[in-house]
C-alpha cells in the first residue's frame, strides 16, 4: 500500500513559534541497534548534578536549613528540617511535572514528598511497604535518595526500589499489586523530554496500583501551602546498583530486579508460546523502539530472551538520562526513524515504540500506521481468541471522550458494557476496581487492561503480537502471513472505519489558549440542534461532564464538543501534562461505513471538518499558530 493511502497521520516539524524547547533537542536520531548486557549487570551511567538541592547524608541534612533530632528508633535518627511553602506545586493525577531546575531548588522536591505524607492517613504508610522507581531520566538518582530518607523519616517500614532506580510506570503498578504494597512513587515526566534543561516529574500510586485520586492530590497541594517542617532520616545514600536489602534500624530498602514481577505478570496474561511461534519465524520481522527510555530495560528480557526475537530487533534499547537527546513520545513525529523503517523498501512486518516511562505505545505494520483509537478496538474485538487472560471474554470496554468511536461499535456488537470517560487513567481504574471494565484506551497512544491500573505500552505490543500470532498460527513456511494492514482492514470491513485525527499545538501561550476555550464555551452556550456549520448540521454541542458510576464524583469542563447529525465530531481540549505553557488539542472524527472509501487518507477524508474546526475556534487569532506541532 502506498504511504499516502495507508498513513492516517502526518509528520510536521515543530514550528519556531514553540518556546522553551530548543530545536536541537528534538532532532530525529538514527535508530541504534545495540548489544545488551545481561540484566544482572544492567546499569546506565549518570552525570553528576551540581548543586544538589537537598543533600541528605550521614554528615549533612540540608544546605539551607538547620535541623534538630526529634526521634531515634534503634539506629535510625530522625531529623526535623524547618522549611517554608514553595509556590507552584499544584498536583494532578499525573503528579507534579516541572523543569529539572525547578525541582533542584532547595527543598522543592522534599516539600512535596513531605506534603504527600502529611496528606495520607497514618495507616496508609506507617510501618508499611512503598515501591519506588522511575524512567531513568536526569535527576532520578538524587530524587530517589531524597524520597527514601523522607519515607524513613515518616515511619515507612520498607522501600522496594528497582535496580538503578529503574521501574516502568506499569511495573510499579504491577509490583504494588503483587507485593500488596501501600503505594508507590513514580519518578517520571512520562513522554516529556529529559535532561538538565528539560522535564522531571513525580507521582504517587495507591495500593490498587492506581494513581492517587483528586481527593489526595488536592490535599497534597493544600499541604504544600502550609508546610513548616520536613521529617528526614539521617542515613547514608543507598547503593541502588546492587540487588539486596539494606537495613537502618527498623527501616529497610530492598533493591529488586525491575523486570521480574512485570515479566511474570505478562506470562500470566499472554500465551508466550503462541507469540514465540510467530516471533521466531524466519519470515516474520519486527522492530521495537524503546526510544532510549525505560522499556529498554524490559525489551531484551521479554522480546529476545523469552520470545525469541533477534537482538537486532531492539532499537534504542539502553535507557539514557536524556533519552539520547530525543523526545520519548511514540508518535509519527518523534519516532520518525521507526516510521521510515516500516515504510522503507522491504520493511519489517511489525513495528512498535513506547514512551519515556513505558505507558504509551505506537503500533505499525509494513507501510501502515494503526491509530490508537483503532488499536484498542481491534484488541477488544480479538482478545477472547488471541489473549489467554480474556478467554472468558472482557467484562466491559471504555475509552476517553476524545478517542474515536471505534471501540463503541465493538462493545455494541459484542453486547458489552461501555463507558465514555474524561481523559485520565484514574477514571478507568475506578471502573476496573468495581469489576466493570477489562479493556480501555486513549487516543493519546495509551492502551491497557485491568491486569494493572496504568496504561501499558509493552502490554499493547504483546496484545498485537498475540493477535498476529493467532491469525497466522496455521500458516506454513512460505505462505503469505496475515499482516497488520490485513487485520485492520478486516476490522473496518466488519465495523466500519472511524476516520480520526488530532492536531496538537504545543507550548502555546497560556492566556491565548484559555481565551480560545472560553470563547468556545460561550459559543456552545448559544448553540442549538439544527444549527448549520457549513454542510454540517449540529446535533449538540457541550462541555463534556462525567459522573462516575462507581463513586458518584463529577468531572466537569472536560472538553468542548461539537457533535453533528452524521456522527462527526470536533473536540477542543487543553492538555496539562507538559511542564510549561499549554497544549491545545483539536480532535476530528468522521464515521465511514463504505468499504470502498476505507483506503482514503484520513487528512483528505477529514479536510472539511478540519477546516471547520480551525475556523470555528479562531485558533490562529487566539494563539498565533499557523501550523500544529504534531498531527496524528
UniProtKB/Swiss-Prot annotation:
Transmembrane segments: none
Cofactor(s) listed: Mg(2+)
Cofactor note: Binds 1 Mg(2+) ion per subunit.
Listed EC numbers: 5.4.2.2
The organism's place on the tree of life at top rank: Eukaryota
Reactions that this protein is recorded to catalyse: alpha-D-glucose 1-phosphate = alpha-D-glucose 6-phosphate; O-phospho-L-seryl-[protein] + alpha-D-glucose 1-phosphate = alpha-D-glucose 1,6-bisphosphate + L-seryl-[protein]; alpha-D-glucose 1,6-bisphosphate + L-seryl-[protein] = O-phospho-L-seryl-[protein] + alpha-D-glucose 6-phosphate
InterPro entries: A-D-PHexomutase_a/b/a-I, A-D-PHexomutase_a/b/a-I/II/III, A-D-PHexomutase_a/b/a-II, A-D-PHexomutase_a/b/a-III, A-D-PHexomutase_C_sf, A-D-PHexomutase_CS, Alpha-D-phosphohexomutase_SF, PGM
Subunit structure, as described in the record: Monomer.
Listed name of the protein: Phosphoglucomutase, chloroplastic
Annotated source species: Solanum tuberosum
Organism taxonomic ancestry: Eukaryota, Viridiplantae, Streptophyta, Embryophyta, Tracheophyta
Amino acid at each position: 500500500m502506498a504511504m499516502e493511502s495507508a498513513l492516517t497521520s502526518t509528520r510536521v516539524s515543530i514550528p519556531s513559534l514553540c518556546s522553551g524547547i530548543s530545536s536541537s533537542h528534538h532532532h530525529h536520531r538514527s535508530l541504534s541497534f545495540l548489544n545488551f548486557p545481561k540484566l544482572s549487570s544492567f546499569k546506565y551511567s549518570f552525570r553528576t548534578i551540581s548543586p544538589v538541592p537537598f543533600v541528605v547524608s550521614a554528615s549533612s541534612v540540608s544546605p539551607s536549613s538547620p535541623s534538630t533530632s526529634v526521634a531515634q528508633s534503634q539506629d535510625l535518627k530522625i531529623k526535623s528540617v524547618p522549611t517554608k511553602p514553595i509556590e507552584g506545586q499544584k498536583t494532578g493525577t499525573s503528579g507534579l511535572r516541572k523543569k529539572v531546575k525547578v525541582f533542584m531548588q532547595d527543598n522543592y522536591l522534599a516539600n512535596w514528598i513531605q506534603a504527600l505524607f502529611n496528606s495520607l492517613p497514618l495507616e496508609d504508610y506507617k510501618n508499611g511497604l512503598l515501591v519506588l522507581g522511575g524512567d531513568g531520566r536526569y535527576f532520578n538518582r538524587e530524587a530517589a535518595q531524597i524520597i527514601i530518607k523522607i519515607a524513613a523519616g515518616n515511619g515507612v517500614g520498607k522501600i522496594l526500589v528497582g535496580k538503578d532506580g529503574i521501574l516502568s510506570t506499569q511495573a510499579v503498578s504491577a509490583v504494588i499489586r503483587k507485593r500488596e504494597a501501600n503505594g508507590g512513587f513514580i519518578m517520571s515526566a512520562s513522554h516529556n523530554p529529559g535532561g538538565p534543561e528539560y522535564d522531571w516529574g513525580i507521582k504517587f500510586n495507591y495500593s490498587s496500583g492506581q494513581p492517587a485520586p483528586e481527593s489526595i492530590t488536592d490535599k497534597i497541594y493544600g499541604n504544600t501551602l502550609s508546610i513548616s517542617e520536613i521529617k528526614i532520616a539521617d542515613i547514608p545514600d543507598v547503593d541502588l546498583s546492587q540487588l539486596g536489602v539494606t537495613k537502618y534500624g527498623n527501616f529497610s530498602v530492598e533493591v529488586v530486579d525491575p523486570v521480574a514481577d512485570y515479566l511474570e505478570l505478562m506470562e500470566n496474561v499472554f500465551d508466550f508460546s503462541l507469540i514465540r511461534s510467530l516471533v521466531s519465524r524466519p519470515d516474520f520481522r519486527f522492530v521495537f523502539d524503546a526510544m532510549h527510555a525505560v522499556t529498554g530495560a524490559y525489551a531484551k528480557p521479554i522480546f529476545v530472551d523469552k520470545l525469541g526475537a533477534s537482538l537486532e530487533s531492539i532499537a534504542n534499547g539502553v535507557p539514557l538520562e536524556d533519552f539520547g537527546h530525543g523526545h520519548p513520545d511514540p508518535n509519527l513525529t518523534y519516532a520518525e526513524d521507526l516510521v521510515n523503517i516500516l515504510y522503507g523498501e522491504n520493511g519489517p512486518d511489525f513495528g512498535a515504540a513506547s514512551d519515556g516511562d513505558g505507558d504509551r505505545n505506537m503500533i505499525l505494520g509494513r507501510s501502515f500506521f494503526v491509530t490508537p483509537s483503532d488499536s484498542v478496538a481491534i484488541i477488544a474485538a480479538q482478545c477472547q481468541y488471541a489473549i489467554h487472560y480474556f478467554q472468558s471474554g472482557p467484562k466491559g470496554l471504555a475509552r476517553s471522550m476524545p478517542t474515536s468511536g471505534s471501540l463503541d461499535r465493538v462493545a455494541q456488537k459484542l453486547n458489552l458494557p461501555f463507558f465514555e470517560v474524561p481523559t485520565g487513567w484514574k477514571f478507568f481504574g475506578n471502573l476496573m476496581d468495581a469489576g466493570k471494565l477489562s479493556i480501555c484506551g486513549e487516543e493519546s497512544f495509551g492502551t491497557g487492561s485491568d491486569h494493572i491500573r496504568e496504561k501499558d505500552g509493552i502490554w499493547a505490543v504483546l496484545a498485537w503480537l498475540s493477535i498476529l500470532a493467532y491469525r497466522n498460527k496455521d500458516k506454513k513456511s512460505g505462505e503469505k502471513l496475515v499482516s497488520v494492514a490485513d487485520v485492520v482492514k478486516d476490522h473496518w470491513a466488519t465495523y466500519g472505519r472511524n476516520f480520526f485525527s488530532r492536531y496538537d499545538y504545543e507550548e502555546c501561550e497560556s492566556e491565548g489558549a484559555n481565551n480560545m476555550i472560553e470563547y468556545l464555551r460561550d459559543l456552545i452556550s448559544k448553540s442549538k440542534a439544527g444549527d448549520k456549520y457549513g454542510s454540517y448540521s449540529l446535533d449538540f454541542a457541550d462541555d463534556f461532564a462525567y459522573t462516575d458510576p462507581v463513586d458518584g464524583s463529577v468531572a466537569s469542563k472536560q472538553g468542548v464538543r461539537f457533535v453533528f447529525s452524521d456522527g462527526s465530531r470536533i473536540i477542543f481540549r487543553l492538555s496539562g501534562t507538559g511542564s510549561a505553557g499549554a497544549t491545545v488539542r483539536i480532535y476530528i472524527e468522521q464515521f465511514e461505513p463504505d468499504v470502498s472509501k476505507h483506503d482514503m487518507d484520513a487528512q483528505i477524508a477529514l479536510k472539511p471538518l478540519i477546516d471547520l474546526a480551525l475556523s470555528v475556534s479562531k485558533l490562529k487569532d487566539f494563539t498565533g499558530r499557523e501550523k500544529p506541532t504534531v498531527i496524528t
